[in-house]
């Protein structure tokens, strides 16, 4: 467990290019992770699920999420809006515009830390 606060600036963190349309930066603590996700219009995050609870806060742009095993719950999330995705809920996303979102995960995404997130690449 960390016993000291750490201070970060997004622009000082390396921006990882996951594919030609999606990039990210993230910060990890003991029990949570926060990420800036950069999506070009038309970017697709394929259907996946994870053990982590997820909050997605769109800062700029707009994302369309398909939620559930059949993707039958469709939600558009615009700048200034937040989507809470429970653990183990299948979901995918499409960037309807160039988008910057903040994703918060609890616990941290171990697959991201291990580089085992091939669905994004």
Regions found by a protein language model. Give the residues of each.
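A cytosolic small-molecule/anion-sensing beta-strand core signal
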Residues: 59-60, 78-79, 97
């Amino acid at each position: 467990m960390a016993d000291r606060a750490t201070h970060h600036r997004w622009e000082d963190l390396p921006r990882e290019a996951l594919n030609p349309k999606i990039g990210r930066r993230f910060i990890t603590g003991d029990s949570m992770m926060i990420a800036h996700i950069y999506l070009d219009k038309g970017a697709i995050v394929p259907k996946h699920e994870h053990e982590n609870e997820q909050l997605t806060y769109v800062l700029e742009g707009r994302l369309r999420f398909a939620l559930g095993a059949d993707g039958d719950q469709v939600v558009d999330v615009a700048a200034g809006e937040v989507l809470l995705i429970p653990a183990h809920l299948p979901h995918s996303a499409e960037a309807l515009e160039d988008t910057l979102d903040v994703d918060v995960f609890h616990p941290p995404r171990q697959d991201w830390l291990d580089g085992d997130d091939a669905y994004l690449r």
